[in-house]
């Protein structure tokens, strides 16, 4: 009897210990779209209302240009930027459309990794990874520091695809290693934007371009190549996603009209879906069981589909006859630049100023509603089971109630240009604008969260 009681107490303690470790890991925001890489948060504790006069804890000017997302580990915030002598900043959607083609750089940029204190935004250190002149021009709306860094809690890994540089820096700002993986021309001259992810000592890099595409795994300890897989895909801007399903773990890489699942350990192709129409800008969403993904071209909306762990080998996406492993598919429902997100039983997709809600189990569209007076949306969504957050480029964030009915709970405004995907940690919301990094946090004396 005593043994049974002891075992029960031991298991209870073990569960509490594991949960505490899990919650600590989830409290940090170590990569693009958070710890699970899909924008999901267990419970969002940052304020639901903010402005320049409400719940704005601090703002910090950031030199140069960069659409990379900030990442958070403990009290440290990391982000990258590329700085020239003119302190060049990106243009918004309208400005980019008017100018279209960017000018080829005529001078070198400082490619920097910055570390800030999350409490007050003060600068801990700034490290110049390299000073180099990019070989290719980019779209005026893009930057030379659009790829988000990632951390394992000991080092920060950053990737500047425009110059082909990958580097590891410790938490004191010391360069540990750096390697060159090559710089290549991009489709339509837009530039690059695929962020990093890592797992089990491997750093994964997606480099889809118009010359020599590949996905690469580097050893986090020294930057040496573990495996490299050549790809037929042309330019794509989606980021690699680690999908831990009931059968295996896949490194999911979305390319131009294709989605491929690689074995993260070896680089072997586990499965491949073709006929997905065009290049992917958005990254996958997930509910922990399935992944949800899609794309859209500049003139029309592309497919939206769900993939289950039964997917295997190579198959062609066919809406009329779904191949094995495709749970459901819609001909026209894909996202624009903003990655979709799962909240509860629903999948949310943003495209062309509309928010669409789908049943994640069947793909049935529940609603499609216009976001009032919204501008272009590039930043990916984030959500818990009760709220969905979307931020347009003008700094307006819509807080939408999760569920079958479209209901905007709040609209929050900051004055800057925003394309970067936010970061969330321990009641803090970090929003990167073109000019400043903003920290939203409950300020005592504010009545509403």
Residues of each region from the PLM?
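Positively charged n-region of N-terminal signal peptides that target proteins for export
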Residues: 1-9
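Noncatalytic, solvent-exposed loop/strand surfaces
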Residues: 25-449
